[in-house]
Amino acid sequence: MYAIIKASGQQFKVQEGDIICFDNMGLEPKSAVEFKEVLAVDNGELTVGTPFVEGAVVKGEVINEGRDKKVIIYKKRRRKDSKLKRGFRRDFTRVRITKIA
């Protein structure tokens, strides 16, 4: 059984027990979270929503929040003595899927 959910502007294919990582939602660790924007559910037969499946809910538990490793962005324009170096660290929330209903 799997479901396709929309969380933080992204779509994820999840099963019970999966761990997903997405943009920070500002939730407390060990708290419960419900994803009501379920795009599709497959439990033997595929049910696709228009745009969401009515009555379908995916429940999860927040594991932790944190920051990813730094990504270095470097741009250089040749022969112009022009270069730009920036770093970026994404804040994330990690959630374990507990139930698909």
UniProtKB/Swiss-Prot annotation:
Q: Which Pfam families match?
A: Ribosomal_L21p (PF00829)
Instruction: List the PROSITE patterns.
Output: RIBOSOMAL_L21
What's one GO BP annotation on this UniProt entry?
A: translation
Q: Which UniProt keywords apply?
A: Ribonucleoprotein, Ribosomal protein, RNA-binding, rRNA-binding
Superkingdom is Bacteria
List, in alphabetical order, the Gene Ontology terms for molecular function in this entry. Answer: rRNA binding; structural constituent of ribosome
InterPro entries, alphabetized: bL21-like (IPR028909), bL21-like_sf (IPR036164), Ribosomal_bL21 (IPR001787), Ribosomal_bL21_CS (IPR018258)
Ribosomal protein as UniProt keyword: yes
Q: How does it assemble?
A: Part of the 50S ribosomal subunit. Contacts protein L20.
NCBIfam families on file: L21
Described by its record, this protein's role is as follows: This protein binds to 23S rRNA in the presence of protein L20.
Name of the featured protein: Large ribosomal subunit protein bL21
